[in-house]
């Protein structure tokens, strides 16, 4: 989330976010698409020097009003993981379609933002599949292969549920770097806040 909520460490200030994106551009970092990340992790595909993947969870309104224009300004690919069940309270379908049409990858964060680790395999499949259906119907994204676990929460059924629901790669909340050979259903990310 990007905004000016100084008391919430889950929110990065807009000025710092702009500085960070400028730093990436000025210092030769190369933002990758999810497909490029997947090919690197699973198949060992080459990636450019200084690779970085920009992901944004939950689909807050600022994703459209702040993040999206900055991504367009710098020409950076990015992925936004949304909960279709929350559409209308944060983003609208029109905003999601516009971002998708203009190079932002829209991906699955579950129909509802619920902890997957608290659900049976069948309920996990249902939460993922319902979101897949909404992405196909509302945005035209058929067979979306990317998922981000709400709260980063998983259990022993989650990898299997993800596969059965058509997911090829799942993003975790644990901090770390992605490497060739990593479990594609447990891709680590680095939290970036007001630092």
Predicted segments — roles?
Residues 1-55, 61-62, 118-195:
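C-terminal active-site subregion of NodB/CE4 polysaccharide deacetylases
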Residues 60-61, 112:
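Short, glycine/acidic-enriched loop or turn micro-motifs at the edges of active sites
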Residues 99, 106-109, 131, 187:
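Structural signal for hydrophobic
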